[in-house]
A protein has these predicted regions:
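Class I S-adenosyl-L-methionine-dependent methyltransferase catalytic core
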Residues: 1-202
Length: 202
């Protein structure tokens, strides 16, 4: 499957029915999801690998990994409603994915894998500052390789946070197209600069 084909397929994934701002539940844009997954694919980190989507939401990254030939794909989230949507999305696209209700803070409930893919919260809400840290910690605990979407300019923070535990071996700039989802949003569409980081466990 080519990059454009993957993007078109992922555009069929439904988003959150009732997103929660406190959890920063925003649907990962198909273009950005496809970019992350295809970079992982060409690096040999998807095909015939076991892949985990941490904080999978409605499943777009997990489903994309399955479409690219992962041997086994699991997605985990704490929101049962999002997981139900994820299961519907996977069925729609014929993707074999197992979705699990689990908190990233409970790594003992999450099986090890070859590759983690994730779009963790950016910590944009006051009650959610540093919300990406448990995701990074969990990823390093369960997988040797991680691909994550972070706010642009996060590389230095992530490097410092994982010092001694892992290294950033790849960085790709991207854009998160954020549609109006909540009453406090002032624009119908906002383009947020992001970066996709490849993290390898030390």
């Amino acid at each position: 499957m080519k990059l454009r084909q993957l993007e078109i397929a992922l555009q069929r994934c439904a988003g959150f029915e009732r997103p929660r701002a406190s959890r920063e539940q925003y649907q990962t844009p198909a273009t950005l999801a496809a970019r992350l997954l295809y970079d992982a694919f060409v690096s040999g980190d998807i095909a015939e690998k076991t892949v985990m989507d941490l904080g999978c939401g409605t499943g777009i990254l997990a489903i994309g990994a399955a479409l690219l030939g992962a041997r086994e794909v699991r997605g985990t989230d704490i929101d049962p409603e999002a997981l139900r949507t994820a299961e519907k999305n996977a069925a729609l696209l014929g993707a074999d994915v197992t979705f699990i209700a689990a908190d990233v803070g409970s790594t003992e409930k999450i099986d090890p894998c070859d590759t983690v893919v994730m779009n963790p919260p950016f910590g944009a809400q006051k009650q959610n500052i540093h919300a990406d840290r448990p995701f990074i910690d969990c990823a390093l605990a369960i997988a040797p390789v991680t691909y994550g979407i972070f706010n642009a300019g996060s590389t230095a923070f992530v490097e410092a946070y994982i010092a001694g535990r892992g290294n950033i071996t790849g960085r790709v700039a991207g854009t998160f197209s954020l549609k109006r989802s909540f009453t406090f949003h002032t624009r119908d569409l906002q383009e947020i600069p992001v970066e996709i980081l490849r993290i390898v466990r030390a």
